């Protein structure tokens, strides 16, 4: 190929000739290093000896941190950044690059590897532009990440993709009216012509968004460009929202890992397809390939000539828009519509990972604006005791981390106890002895004083669950009538009708064992019930009660919860054993879930140094499947739970045969209160588990529970951590509305995190149903890579050291139900008890002395 002008450029000791043709865009790069701008004597980063021109990116000093972030340097649109822009953007950081000034690599950033080793390279493609009336969301750019072995001084070429341009605000008054929603000129012209996108009726052309540019990371090998990573750009949105958007799932991200695969460009029509690795642009609207300069395609000429639309593709091969959206750039460019109709979005490009790399994470569409590249050292910590280490820039090595109270030995592997210099032993003994004697004297005086007041203080004790249980057993308190509260113990109680199909339990058949804690209405007890149909043996249950003094609203809420709980019959929803609503005290009897709530169980099961977790990845997947089964049942019965969270899920036991069940319907009950939808009443809204449409507009559908289930998955695989760590509810609201999503928990398998991200789609229609979630969880249980994943080691103190209550011997096996010969009705009668005051007429019997002391077995999920 002939050249009109030739430019000779040298990089160090390696030289090559770059052949450029100003009048043609069909010149391809064969063996050309990055063309540089002329060095400036005022720029300290550039030095130019008489015969050799060095790049402006010297090797990083030994003190440089092992993480580098590359951006668009503030550039946007079709063209890449300049050297001046990148110098300003990277000022004050460890990133030093050389930016191409001309030719096919104009806008490409050159960076040199500071030292040999393995590097984790993460690339983010740019998002596509929004359409004039399709602006609720944009097509996300794709994220890819892999590990590469790089040598000292090796040159990496980095092209950071730029976001495709939006159609609005438009370039003419008429187009601006369309953007504001005050004009339907495009739709009216389409209706009159009857063409809806057929070429020839171009008066209404334009209004689509440009395709997003791809992000490329490549190097030169044997005189040829070799791609390492290509993160595809998102396709541009069309003028109108697609008609079938609500009935189709989002297309999966595409990945290519064959070096010999062709890097072709996307097909297009009036809107251009995305540029590929080696393609040739067939039209001005098509995005240029990397070897053509990777410029974004122009907007179609008809759009500019009529309504002033000019939505170009982003730098990185994004296709220009017309009425349809442009295709996204990539290793292979995304296609654009050939008919240019009103609702044809551009397709995303195809990502690429070199086969010589170690795949770190499957591609995922996450980027909502410009692309970026992050490079960090990949540390090999397999030799460390905790399998964890950190990079020491001064020593240029990975230093192992040791537990608290220990230090690293000289061999950089062994952890040993900290050396504590011995103190003056005699003085220490004297101080301890004196302090002990003084403390004993003070305690003796206090004991003598307190003994005189002990009887009075016993009468003034604050109410507690155990005190309330004692009062129910012995008290005969009578209350005066108050019109604002229901009467307790005065006259006959109002009879409430029972729902059909629910077992009515007489209070005479209920025995209280011990208090579990406080609920939303009153106390919750562990107890025994006899006389159930078809079962003569006593059954352990959890008993919800209504307090002595209650308002009419409390009575209605209690009845509503009873109706909701008794409605469901499923193995993964806590079963309602029976109700007692015809006389006071009102009772709801639930099956006793001895394993406690899921959140506390997960926190207690975290692995610690010297204390492995009793759980494996299959156990976590089983917990998720159990709750998904319950949610699927609710979804099929058109019931919206509104508060799927780990704290509201209970375990039948803590052993291997555990079954997880949904155990709280408080949010579902509260929606029937008139005050529920008042703006600003955030106390009733669990913001961290709710999608944007729920806390912004008060819209609840089955897709609301899908979002909450994604957060529950995050809780399960983080072993009980609070979602959105370190953020307040208001910060979470702003973060989610702004498009932010949580990162995967440490050690979470990629397929499981993909289920979370699908549940967190901004558009409710794009979130999967629970039938689809169950299918994807089943795939995970059949994936050896997922099942063999290890739980991350916890470096902090164990729950016992933190003072939290553990599960004790409950973690070894399920609680066995009482045997009939141990708890026969005759023995229950022999236990006896004193009169129960207001409970006397109902015949409710407490369990007398069995040595049962108050224990913190209360689960907050038992509350409403």
Swiss-Prot record:
EC number from the UniProt entry: 2.7.10.1
GO annotation, cellular component aspect: membrane; plasma membrane; receptor complex
Transmembrane region(s): 425-449
Subcellular location, principal: membrane
GO MF terms, alphabetically ordered: ATP binding; protein kinase activity; protein tyrosine kinase activity; receptor signaling protein tyrosine kinase activator activity; transmembrane receptor protein tyrosine kinase activity
Cytoplasm found in the keyword field: no
PTM annotation, UniProt: Phosphorylated at tyrosine residues by autocatalysis, which activates kinase activity.
Residues bearing the modification Phosphotyrosine: 676
Effect of substituting residue 241 to A: Abolished homodimerization following interaction with ALKAL1
Signal peptide (from-to): 1-16
Localization per record: Cell membrane
Domain Protein kinase per the UniProt entry, residue ranges: 510-786
Topological domains annotated Extracellular: 17-424
InterPro entries reported in the protein's UniProt record: ALK/LTK-like_GRD, Kinase-like_dom_sf, Prot_kinase_dom, Protein_kinase_ATP_BS, RTK, Ser-Thr/Tyr_kinase_cat_dom, Tyr_kinase_AS, Tyr_kinase_cat_dom
Family: Belongs to the protein kinase superfamily. Tyr protein kinase family. Insulin receptor subfamily.
Implicated disorder: Genetic variations in LTK that cause up-regulation of the PI3K pathway may possibly contribute to susceptibility to abnormal proliferation of self-reactive B-cells and, therefore, to systemic lupus erythematosus (SLE). SLE is a chronic, inflammatory and often febrile multisystemic disorder of connective tissue, thought to represent a failure of the regulatory mechanisms of the autoimmune system.
Role summary: Receptor with a tyrosine-protein kinase activity. Following activation by ALKAL1 or ALKAL2 ligands at the cell surface, transduces an extracellular signal into an intracellular response. Ligand-binding to the extracellular domain induces tyrosine kinase activation, leading to activation of the mitogen-activated protein kinase (MAPK) pathway. Phosphorylates almost exclusively at the first tyrosine of the Y-x-x-x-Y-Y motif.
Protein name: Leukocyte tyrosine kinase receptor
Source species of the chain: Homo sapiens
């Amino acid at each position: 190929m002939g050249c009109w002008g030739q430019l000779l450029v040298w990089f160090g000791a390696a030289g090559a000739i770059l052949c450029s043709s100003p009048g043609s865009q069909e010149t391809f790069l064969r063996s050309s290093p990055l063309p540089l701008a002329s060095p400036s004597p005022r720029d300290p980063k550039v030095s130019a000896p008489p015969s050799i021109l060095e790049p402006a990116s010297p090797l990083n000093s030994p003190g440089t941190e092992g993480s580098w972030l590359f951006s668009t340097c503030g550039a946007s649109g079709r063209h890449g950044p300049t050297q001046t822009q990148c110098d300003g953007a990277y000022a004050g950081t460890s990133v030093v690059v050389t930016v191409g000034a001309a030719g096919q690599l104009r806008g490409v950033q050159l960076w040199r590897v500071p030292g040999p080793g393995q590097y984790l390279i993460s690339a983010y493609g740019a998002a596509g532009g929004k359409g004039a009336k399709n602006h609720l969301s944009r097509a996300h750019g794709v994220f890819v990440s892999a590990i590469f072995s790089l040598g000292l001084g090796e040159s990496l070429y980095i092209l950071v993709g730029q976001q495709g341009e939006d159609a609005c605000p438009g370039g003419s008054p008429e187009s601006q009216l369309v953007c504001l929603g005050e004009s339907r000129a495009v739709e009216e012209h389409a209706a009159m012509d009857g063409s809806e996108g057929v070429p020839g009726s171009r008066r209404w052309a334009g209004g689509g968004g440009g395709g997003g540019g791809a992000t490329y990371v490549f190097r030169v090998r044997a005189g040829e460009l070799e791609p390492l990573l290509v993160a595809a750009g998102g396709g541009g949105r069309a003028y109108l929202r697609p008609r079938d958007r609500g009935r189709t799932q989002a297309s999966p991200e595409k990945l290519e890992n064959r070096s010999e695969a062709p890097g072709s460009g996307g097909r297009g029509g009036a809107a251009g397809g995305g540029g590929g690795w080696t393609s040739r642009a067939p039209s001005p609207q098509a995005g240029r390939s990397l070897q053509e300069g990777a410029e974004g395609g122009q907007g179609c000429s008809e759009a500019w000539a009529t309504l002033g639309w000019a939505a170009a593709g982003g730098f990185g091969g994004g296709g220009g828009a017309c009425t349809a959206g442009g295709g996204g750039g990539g290793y292979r460019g995304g296609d654009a519509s050939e008919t240019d109709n009103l609702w044809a979005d551009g397709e995303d490009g195809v990502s690429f990972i070199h086969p010589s790399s170690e795949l770190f994470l499957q591609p995922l569409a996450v980027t909502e604006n410009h692309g970026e590249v992050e490079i960090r050292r990949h540390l090999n910590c397999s030799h460390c005791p905790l399998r964890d280490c950190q990079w020491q820039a001064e020593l240029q090595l990975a230093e192992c981390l040791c537990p608290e109270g220990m230090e690293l030995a000289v061999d950089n592997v062994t952890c040993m106890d900290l050396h504590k210099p011995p103190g003056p032993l005699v003085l220490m003994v004297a101080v301890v002895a004196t302090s002990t004697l003084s403390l004993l004297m003070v305690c003796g005086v206090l004991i003598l004083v307190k003994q005189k007041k002990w009887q009075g203080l016993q009468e003034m004790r604050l109410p507690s669950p155990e005190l309330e249980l004692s009062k129910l057993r012995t008290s005969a308190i009578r209350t005066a009538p108050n019109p604002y509260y229901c009467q307790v113990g005065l006259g006959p109680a109002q009879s409430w009708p029972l729902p059909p199909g629910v077992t009515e339990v007489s209070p005479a058949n209920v025995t209280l064992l011990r208090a579990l804690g406080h609920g939303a209405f009153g106390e919750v007890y562990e107890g025994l019930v006899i006389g159930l149909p078809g079962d003569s043996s006593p059954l352990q249950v959890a008993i919800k009660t209504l307090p002595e003094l209650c308002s009419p609203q409390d009575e209605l809420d209690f009845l509503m919860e009873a109706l909701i709980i008794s409605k469901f019959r499923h193995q993964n929803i806590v079963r309602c054993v029976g109700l007692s609503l015809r006389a006071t005290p009102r009772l709801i009897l639930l099956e006793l879930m001895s394993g406690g709530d899921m959140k506390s169980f997960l926190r207690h099961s975290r692995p610690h140094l010297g204390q492995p977790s009793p759980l494996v990845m299959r156990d976590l997947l089983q917990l998720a499947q159990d709750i998904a089964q319950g949610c699927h049942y609710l979804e099929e019965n058109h019931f919206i739970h509104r508060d799927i969270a780990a704290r509201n899920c209970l375990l039948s036991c803590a052993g291997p045969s555990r079954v997880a069940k949904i155990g709280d319907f408080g949010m579902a009950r509260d929606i029937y209160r008139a005050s529920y939808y008042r703006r600003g009443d955030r106390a009733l809204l669990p913001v961290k588990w709710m999608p944007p449409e729920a806390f912004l507009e008060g819209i609840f559908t089955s897709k609301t529970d899908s979002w909450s289930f994604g957060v529950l998955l995050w809780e399960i695989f983080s072993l009980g951590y609070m979602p959105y760590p370190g953020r307040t509810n208001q910060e979470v609201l702003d973060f989610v509305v702004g498009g932010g999503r949580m990162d995967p928990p440490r050690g979470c398998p990629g397929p499981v995190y993909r289920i979370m991200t699908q549940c967190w789609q901004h558009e409710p229609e794009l979130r999967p149903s629970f039938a689809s979630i169950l299918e994807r969880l089943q795939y995970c249980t059949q994936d050896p890579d997922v099942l063999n994943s290890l739980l991350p080691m916890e470096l902090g103190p164990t729950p016992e050291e933190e003072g939290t209550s553990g599960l004790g011997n409950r973690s070894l096996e399920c609680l066995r139900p009482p045997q009939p010969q141990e708890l026969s009705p005759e023995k229950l009668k022999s236990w006896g008890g004193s009169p129960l005051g207001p409970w006397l007429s109902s015949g409710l019997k407490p369990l007398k002395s069995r040595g049962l002391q108050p224990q913190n077995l209360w689960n907050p999920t038992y509350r409403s």
